[in-house]
Amino acid sequence: MRFTLLLVAFITPLVNATENTDWPNYASDPGSSKFAALDHINATNVQKVEVAWSWESPDNQMVKKNRKLTPWGFKSTPIKIGKTLYVSTSLGHVAAISADDGKTIWTFDTKTYADGR
């Protein structure tokens, strides 16, 4: 009986974590599963999915102004807390984006590109 209670105690937090829609860690969870247990999109409605919003990285304007900057093929996995997405860009910006409408809340320029990193 004691083993069963311990097992339930360890499994319950894992089940609750998958029901949460926040992605507070890289790739969703400490195991980097990139999985969210949501049933909003499924085989019967996937054809009807549309883009809700898009976001333009501040890197785009920087490259237009300075063609020597190269944003490489960097791909970031954002984290989501509440209604805010946090993402980094290939030129080292960090941004907070509204999950509701894709509007930029704030950006921070780390200037790592200045040192060629």
Regions found by a protein language model. Name each.
Residues 8-17:
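Hydrophobic h-region of N-terminal signal peptides that target proteins for export
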Residues 18-58:
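Blade/loop signatures of beta-propeller domains
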Residues 23-27, 69-93, 117:
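Repeat-blade elements of multi-bladed beta-propeller folds
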Residues 51, 103-107:
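Predominantly a core beta-strand signature of beta-propeller blades
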Residues 55-77, 107-117:
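Extracytoplasmic beta-rich repeat domains
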Residues 98-101:
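Short loop/turn segments that connect beta-strands within beta-propeller blades
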Residues 1-7:
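Sec-dependent signal peptide recognition
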